[in-house]
Amino acid sequence: MSEKIVMALVVAIFGLTTIVGCGTAKIPQVGDKAPAFTLQSIEGKNISLSDFQGKIVLIVFTSVNCKECETQMPYLVGAYENAGGKLVVLDIYHMIYDPRLVQDYVTSKQFTTFPSLPDLNNTVANSYGATRYPPTNFIIDATGTIKYKKIGPFQSQQEIEDIIKSF
């Protein structure tokens, strides 16, 4: 092979590697700091993760047409109520359509115990690497560190409470 061809291949591979590497965001894992975010609730209030520093935060990435998400809702409510103010639950809804769908859904299902946050363009979900189906659940400790991640619904209230007690 001529030197020119080898040099062209090296430059092409380097350029492609650089382009691909620049477009890849790091998906946070257990032990990482939770990505910061601010979203507007269906009531119009801006809610930031940093608002809850010092508390345990359970973030649920969900969707208006996710049946598995609905099945875990009573477990979330029970764990929240038993935590005595030490636990915050945030329902973040994947959105690619009109955010009023979230309001209509939450109202019809009476899921009003904790903030419902439409995630327009899935910006926050993408920063966490969250899936649309099944739900993706993150538990963040009082220092803002991801302590637990689960893809799929919780199977019981006790499951949630045991995880929270473990840290």
Task: Give each language-model segment a name.
Residues 1-9:
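Bacterial N-terminal signal peptides that target proteins for export
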Residues 70-109, 120-126:
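Structural microenvironment flanking redox-active thiols in thiol-disulfide oxidoreductases
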Residues 33, 55, 132-134:
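Short, small/polar residue-rich loop motifs at catalytic or cofactor-binding pockets
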Residues 47-70, 90:
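Short active-site neighborhood of thiol/selenol oxidoreductases, capturing the structured segment around
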Residues 107-113, 120-164:
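Thiol/disulfide oxidoreductase modules built on the thioredoxin-like
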Residues 22-49:
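N-terminal "domain-start" segment that seeds a small globular fold
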